[in-house]
A protein has these predicted regions:
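A residue-level marker of the well-folded mature domains of exported/periplasmic proteins
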Residues: 1-261
Length: 261
């Protein structure tokens, strides 16, 4: 399913390296939202395949080869770590830099620095408000959200409560998908209610709330055992959310990463 998502943008992104020229030994930096997951692994592999084809097209070998690296935060959605990675990559003066911004406004200082040093920036997966971006490669996220809403409506006979799980509350892709889902339901499905919206970058806070609820249950059952947030699993968080919404007929997740949580 992840490859299908990548294929959707292939005509606008990478289908051929014909006509592309880069100096020998050029370095390209790719920065995603996470270091290791199925989706981001596919992004990294796609970049490597493109550079391999480019080196073959230009006849570059050995030290002359164009190089590409993929980096992302060890914890998905970590804005500070992504900015630190961006700082480190700009210090290497890449020939070009592609980034999937976690926060639409957090990278402006770094983007200014890249512009001053003639480093072109391409955004993919999600975008920012920065005016100097050379190109953007992404899904129509609002339309994707509307499609998700339509699909859920068909599954629950256009009535009932649903829960919405969003990958974060900072990126344009997440905001547009959430907007598309909520707007479509409000406009076309008056008997559907979104009874809860949960953001995965608030997961630590959700674990704290779950720990408090589990501790209360222990006390009600005569146990003094206190549950700590560190011991709470993502499965327990989900179970607690579903317990709070017993009438929920479905859940909408805005990304593949959310469904893996």
């Amino acid at each position: 399913k992840y490859q299908t998502r990548l294929n959707m943008v292939q005509p606008q992104a990478y289908s051929s390296v014909e006509g592309i020229k880069l100096e020998k030994g050029s370095y390209i930096s790719i920065i995603g939202k996470a270091e290791d997951s199925t989706y981001w692994d596919e992004i990294a592999k796609g970049a490597e395949d493109a550079v391999k084809a480019l080196n073959e097209q230009l006849g570059y070998e050995g030290k002359d080869k164009i190089k590409v690296t993929y980096n992302g935060p060890s914890h998905e959605g970590d804005v500070d770590e992504q900015i630190n990675i961006l700082d480190e990559e700009l210090d290497r003066y890449p020939a070009a830099l592609a980034i999937a911004p976690i926060d639409r406004t957090a990278c402006e200082v770094q983007f200014d620095l890249a512009t001053e040093n003639d480093i072109p920036i391409v955004e993919f997966d999600s975008g920012s408000d920065y005016q100097g971006i050379m190109a953007k490669v992404m899904t129509n996220n609002k339309e994707a959200g509307m499609t998700a809403a339509d699909k859920m409506a068909s599954l629950i006979d256009e009535q009932g409560e649903v829960l919405l799980f969003v990958q974060d509350n900072k990126s344009t892709s997440a905001q547009d998908r959430e907007s598309g889902i909520k707007g479509q339901i409000q406009a076309h499905y008056p008997q559907i209610q979104i009874s809860g919206t949960y953001y995965m970058d608030d997961l630590e806070e959700l674990k704290k709330m779950t720990a408090e609820k589990l501790t209360e249950k222990n006390k009600a059952n005569g146990s003094e055992e206190e549950v700590t947030a560190d011991s709470v699993t993502e499965e327990q968080v989900m179970a607690q959310i579903l317990e709070q919404h017993p009438n929920a007929k479905g859940c909408i997740a805005t990304s593949g990463e959310v469904t893996e949580k």
